[in-house]
Amino acid sequence: MIKWIIILLIVAAAASLLGMPALAGAAATGARILIGIVLVIFLLVVLGIFAVT
């Protein structure tokens, strides 16, 4: 999932540099959503609620 976050951030940066604000915003929003999901899963693992084996 971290791989997708990095890809989306690179796409957002490239689109922004090329003058495509809609694509940049969509990619940044996707990355932001994935970052939120990763943080929630991380907190659940740290608190021991969600065990990864």
Curated annotation (Swiss-Prot):
Belongs to the UPF0391 family. It is found in: Cell membrane. Keywords: Cell membrane, Membrane, Transmembrane, Transmembrane helix. This is UPF0391 membrane protein msr4317. The chain crosses the membrane at residues 4-24, 33-53. GO terms for cellular component: plasma membrane. Its main location: membrane. It comes from the Bacteria. Coiled coil: none annotated. It is a multi-pass membrane protein.
